[in-house]
Amino acid sequence: MKYLSTRGHAGQPANPEFCDILLGGLAPDGGLYLPETYPQVTRAELDAWRGLSYAELAFAILSKFITDIPAVDLKAICAKTYTAEVYRHVRAGGDARDITPVHWLEKDADGRGRLGLLELSNGPTLAFKDMAMQLLGNLFEYVLAKRGETINILGATSGDTGSAAEYAMRGKHGVRVFMLSPHGKMSAFQRAQMYSLQDDNIFNIAVTGMFDD
């Protein structure tokens, strides 16, 4: 799968693949990356996906967009990411193995759900951003190891984004995170989440000012 910049001139490498854009972030021309083509999903595939676990479904979808990571490795990354141990903060009566359990508010006479809430905040930081960030951390570690490279990530946060990023990257080989946060402007819970981390590759920097400064 090749990717294109929204501004039309991605630069080098021409038409990069997933691993290139994973480490590069924005395209050299300042645009965002989009797939060169969008995969088609058949009705049979959709029906088959209904019976998959969250990790299996993530692999099935991601494998259509990530073709430069061997399927066996990508499947292992998904299985490592989406586990009951990582997404363990479920409501009473919930099953952490579901990763994103549905809390049904209404059911019909046959007991089938009609109106439900999808829980996305069962990860390490209780933020929905854990859903993507945990996968991103494992992908970063995998690709950097394959290439023999390291990366420094400079981020700025006003709360949950920074926490989710740090908890996803903590302990990851080849990754160092430098996170700017507004001194005294975050909740006590958010400060405790971020500033209590003792990992050697996580650096919290509290600065005077706000996120938009």
Listing of model-derived features with the role each one plays in the protein:
Residues 1-213:
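PLP-dependent amino-acid enzyme catalytic core
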